[in-house]
Amino acid sequence: MPSALVLVHDAVPGRGEREVGTVGPALAELGFDVLVTAFQPGAPPVPDPGDVDVIVVMGSADAAYDDTVPWLGAELDLLARAVGHGTPVLGICFGAQALARVLGGTVARAPRSERGFVALGSADPDVLERGTWMQFHDDAFTLPSGAQQLARNEVGLQAFVCGPHVAVQFHPEITPDAFAAWLDAWDEAGERAALEAAVDIPALVADIAARADVTEAACRRLVGRFCARAGVTAS
């Protein structure tokens, strides 16, 4: 059975697993043994990237360019070793930014935040289909040398592919429960009031629920194409 490492960035036990959304089930349906963990005290040990078949790096409230984040150095080192070993990495939002940084790109504050569902094209539908994807980010990244741009809009680069690695700025994994976990984290951090001043949270919650079936199917296809392209299957 192939193995998948899914890295989350929440210190609260159980909440990181909720934030994985549809990515975990998509990998399980493909026959992967899925380990969800984090560089956090009390989390299961993070395996060596050479001991797993694929790695998925999820989003984070922290910035991939903020070297004061306690666990960031360890995670960037793991991704660098994964790239060196040839272990395919799928980076989602923060994960895409971290992957871009490891591959030689840069990460910085975006010209503006993106919140909600955004329609994106694709330079290669065999990797990333054209569609409407949920965005929730403040940062942006540049295209690493040797990578192929998959999607871009007026805010910046939205997706790229580099060898077996795929990076997407948006959140294909989003579900009502995953977003509820985000809300819990924002409440705990005292950030929800500021977000509600900038975003119509009830409307976004309703939109996520209304699109849940379509979003889940699109995530399954994205994960399936990533694994197939990397040549990692249960068979």
PLM features: residue spans?
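Short alpha-helical
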Residues: R18, Q97, R115, T142, ...
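Short glycine-/acidic-enriched loop or helix-start segments at secondary-structure transitions
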Residues: G16-E17, V46, D66-T68, A100-V102, ...
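A short acidic, often aromatic-flanked loop/helix-cap motif at beta-alpha or helix-coil junctions
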Residues: P41-P45, R115-F117, F141, L157-A159
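N-terminal beta1-alpha1 cap of cysteine-dependent amidohydrolase-like domains
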Residues: M1-H85, E196-S235
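Amide-donor transfer/coupling interface in amidating biosynthetic enzymes
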Residues: S3-L7, A108, S122-S235
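Cysteine-nucleophile active-site neighborhood
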Residues: V57-D124
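Structured loop/turn residues at beta-strand edges in well-structured enzyme cores
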Residues: G50, S113, S145
